[in-house]
Amino acid sequence: MDKRIDYKLVLDTQTCPIEKSDKVSPFNMLTYDIGWLITDKQGRIYKTRSFVIYEIFIGEAEKMKSAYYADKVPKYWDDIRSGKRQLVRFATARRILLEDMREYNVNKIFAHNMFFDCNTLNKTARWITKKHYYFFPFDIELCDTLAMARDVIIPKATYKKFCIDNNYLDKRGKPRATAEILYRFISGDLDFAECHTGLEDTLIEKEIMAYCYKQHKKMRRILYKNNKKFIYEKA
């Protein structure tokens, strides 16, 4: 580890609903796939992890049938058999996350729409342990690449034109800010399709993060800075 580098961790989750609903709420979701990578401001990769959560993927097999990407379950099994992904307990995934953070002295964790990833992990922790309300340690910064992109990418005239030209607009006619569309803009690859698997999605999210830093502009970044700022599901 190079102590001169400010290492960062980029994380992504894939989830299944506890109760079937048309609304996508992190408080109704359980994490079955968590992937992360260690990177820096330039987007260089130093370590990757890909875990399938046993208690949800196996223990909640019926709920897995309602996952938005349930059709990927056979591919997950192929990846587990090949060693591409590891099937582990939730506590094991968290322990290894903390070990990686200590190894690289990480104090910032990024996700695209961190509100969702943070709270579905909190929900999963509560669901499995019946007592723990949180997943991340309290002494780190949770950062949101979606907020960063909204401040430094979406206002760009070139991005607005890109979205208009390719019909990447929401119902109000505003440019969309999905990780897939942002990456298409950054990379110039209009055929790019997001994998919607944990580790693979972090590969594009770290590019969004690096692109935002490269702009050297003021931007929102921190979602929750400490435990006093955490939002928990109301009882």
Please name every model-derived segment.
Residues 143-170:
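Short alpha-helix plus adjacent loop in nuclease-associated cores
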